[in-house]
Amino acid sequence: MTDPAVSPLGCDGLRERRTQAPKETITPASLDPLMSKMRTDESSTVEPEKTTFGRTPDGTVFTVPHTRDMVSQLLSPSEPKNLSDILVLSILALHLLLLRALPTSFRIPVFAFIFLSWRAAYNIGIGWLLHMQSNHRTLVLWARKLQLFVDPSTGENRHPLLYRFIKRELETKIPENYSFENAPIEYNTWLVFRRVVDLILMCDFTSYCLFAVACGSRPVDEGFFMMLLRWSTGLSLVLFNLWVKLDAHRVVKDFAWYWGDFFYLIDQDLTFDGVFEMAPHPMYSVGYAGYYGISLMAASYKVLFISILAHAAQFAFLVLVENPHIEKTYNAPPPRKRVVDPDTALHEEPGSRSNSFNSDATPPMSLPGTTQPRSTHALVGSIDFHRVTDLSVLLIHLLFFAFTMVTPSTPIYRFLFVLNAALWRIWYSAGIGYILDRQSARKSWTRHFVKFGEGQDEAWRQWQGIYHLSMTTCYASFIAAAWKMYTLPQDWGYGLAILRHVLGASLIALQIWTSMSIYESLGEFGWFFGDFFYDESPKLTYSGIYRFLNNPERVLGLAGVWGAVLITNSRAMIFLALLSHTLSIAFIQLVERPHMQKLYGRSLRRDAGLVKSIKRSLPNSLKQFQGSVDKILDESIDFVEEVIDTARPKLAAGVNTFVKDTTALFHKYPARITITRLEPDLAGYELKDYALSVEGTELTQFNKSGGETKEKSQSSRGSENLVFEYGAPIKVKWTAPLNHSKKDWVGLYMVTHNSSREITKVSSQGRWVATNEGAFDSSTSEIGLKSSDISEHSQGKNGKSREVASGEMVFSGDKLWWNQGVFEFRYHHNGKHNVMAISRPFEIRIAKFDENEIPLDNHGVVRPAIEAALLPIVQNCLDRDADIAPQNSEEAFGSQVDRDSKYAKRVVFAVQHMFGIEFAPEVVCADGSVRNLAWRICNAKKVLAPYSMSRSSGTTTPVQED
């Protein structure tokens, strides 16, 4: 019987639940796009029956008469009976008589053969007829060739008796709104086909029930309670099966029940609720629950196995017959797009590509987008040993297989295999979950690849490989552990050994089918959590298995794990199953659910189809109780989330404090192992004669043109804070008494590193310059020294002038900290750490680049502004060396940048704080110019833009202010 809700169709169709479409007047012209109007109503209210119009393949439109279901026609005394009904009932009676007449020893094999024959007539016979009708219109052609429905009065019908017999049979069954002579040949052929189907289906079910009766017995030593439980469970399954069939017929009517769309199409409003919201393919999935209920009541493995065989044959019928017809009828490929006229393309205006750059200005790289990637070489379902991921999976699995086979099943090895499976499950759920959580919150995974100059697509490919390897290895380790814990039963007939294996295998098959259904619904993109990586316009759809369950992986997705528990009958496997289920639920609740709520918000569906169906069937008292339980659970979850949210900042603050303290300790560590050298005798040196003043390039915010305004900052500017540009040279002017030591030196320190103003206790780590040449045995001490011991007069506080020595030095390059913070210079005496003078504190800061304040160019791009802002910073990072630093954005960096990584490290630090993008130093070397680096920054900002917290005034959707 046709399942009207089985196909994951992308267009409107009989088998797809869609929203109700507005009614239109039915005319032959409007029936051309008939299937586009075959809508379904999500509500459970059944409207009064309306006239249904049908259309044949040649376009003939006719009124479809109302027909009754098979069981009512055959068994209801109020329904008129004809010869075909009597024939069907007689054959059913022969089955009953045969069961009574056969000896007990022959009943089981005979009825097994009879049932399998009728099942073959169903799945193979009817399947072949439908296949031929779908592809070649065979049944209609047979009827036309035999002229079965041609009036004998025309002289063209060679079988007048058969004509009158068929006419009487059909008109007896359809007394209203039906004319045998005027009905299309497709409709009459379908009615005759129905009678054949009635015979096969009734005999199929009857022979199955009689086979179960023949096999029925009571197990030895079965207690009354077990017998009561067995029969009550079996009857419940049979009643549930009966409800499924009746509800399905109520929804789909005879048209879908008897595969009417193989003959003609109809236009009607169907109500797909009830059973069609509970499970996919309900006629072929939960619609066979009664078979297993009968098997349970019969207490026979023979009935169970023949039920499984019949169920499998029915799924084969679905896959080989129905689904191809559904795809062909309701999911036809779209018409080919029209090819653009070449003449039109030649006349396209050059300026039509407003977002393109000149070829000489654009680096030879493609811009990765933020839309969903097109999968041309899927990772799931295709094995390619040219790919690292597939080869790694193969090698690891071969290693697992070999290690599992060669090691004995001793307790220590079993423990190791279970431990290995547990660790892989923890990584697969907790480790992968942490990566996705950080990706959802900060896009950390993507940022890592952007840091090394890669794009979003590379991050996506690497993530696919990691996830695929983790998933397959997790299950491979679980299978290996199950193999080690499994022992063959010594007596298959003892206890529930066979049942455990059958149920376990069924659960494993259920998990495999669930995984396939999830992948079919989500595709490669959804399978690998693509919405964590790509910012498409959020559009949530519920198709395939997700029409019935919100999270199928919560239960059905782990059915095979519990199947392994049943098969192995091991407590260790129970532990692994509980661990797997707990971690999977935690993954859904803590990772998937928050991301889905953030991404889709209120468009998330609260109840799936199955939950809706169950809730509608509950009494009001249970509904209220269920609502109270849901409220308690929601409040508990909210409380836990609130506690976590409250504790997170404190934990983060504690971690940050620990990191800062540790960092400061490392900064101070050289001083802890170095004895501070102090000058014991400072007599004759007046501290008032020592002084330090600083000059540097003052930092200003970027102006509207994208550049920077630079001024010289003097120490005489009063109380105004000094803020210097990152990497810019800093000039220091010092004064000291004429008799100052020739081994005096000036060091650069962070203000927070020294608590004492008399003694320096922290090493300068090479950031110092001597006041005089030749005073130290190191040439680096003189780098930056400009002048020394220049006599000048200084005005004292008492107004008296005195002669002092002065000098200048410039701190640049390696003499700078290349960090942000507040710094100071300290003047030290005679090569020791006595502090004679301290400069005014000043701050080194990197200005944030705000693209909202930068006007776009003619192409809507901010890259020129980024180039202008980046150029002076890069020049500073390259020491303003004419052999290394570029003079403009197009000029390449000097070769020294490739040889010494310190230059690239300075640049990436500046870029990170300036634009909020972290690159690896290798990116700077690879780009080789400011222009290419600016392009990469634009590209990275485009990739990371969806995760930016700042409002943009660019070309994105405007945000309405309150």
Swiss-Prot record:
Pfam families: PEMT (PF04191)
Keywords for the protein's UniProt record, in alphabetical order: Endoplasmic reticulum, Lipid biosynthesis, Lipid metabolism, Membrane, Methyltransferase, Phospholipid biosynthesis, Phospholipid metabolism, S-adenosyl-L-methionine, Transferase, Transmembrane, Transmembrane helix
Region entry Disordered, spans: 1-57, 332-373, 780-802
Cytoplasmic topological domain residue ranges: 107-109, 217-223, 299-300, 414, 484-491, 593-962
Protein's pathway: Phospholipid metabolism; phosphatidylcholine biosynthesis
Subcellular location: Endoplasmic reticulum membrane
Biased composition annotated in UniProt, kind: Basic and acidic residues: 38-52, 338-351, 789-802
Database matches in InterPro entries: Phopholipid_MeTrfase (IPR007318), Phosphatid-EA_MeTrfase_fun (IPR016219)
Spans within the Lumenal topological domain: 1-85, 131-195, 245-277, 322-392, 436-462, 513-571
Biased composition annotated in UniProt, kind: Polar residues: 352-361
GO molecular function list: phosphatidylethanolamine N-methyltransferase activity
Membrane topology, record value: Multi-pass membrane protein
Enzyme nomenclature, EC number: 2.1.1.17
Stretches that traverse the bilayer: 86-106, 110-130, 196-216, 224-244, 278-298, 301-321, 393-413, 415-435, 463-483, 492-512, 572-592
Catalytic activity: a 1,2-diacyl-sn-glycero-3-phosphoethanolamine + S-adenosyl-L-methionine = a 1,2-diacyl-sn-glycero-3-phospho-N-methylethanolamine + S-adenosyl-L-homocysteine + H(+)
GO terms of biological process kind: methylation; phosphatidylcholine biosynthetic process
Any GO CC annotation of this UniProt entry: perinuclear endoplasmic reticulum
Summary of the function given for this chain in its UniProt record: Catalyzes the first step of the methylation pathway of phosphatidylcholine biosynthesis, the SAM-dependent methylation of phosphatidylethanolamine (PE) to phosphatidylmonomethylethanolamine (PMME).
Protein name: Phosphatidylethanolamine N-methyltransferase
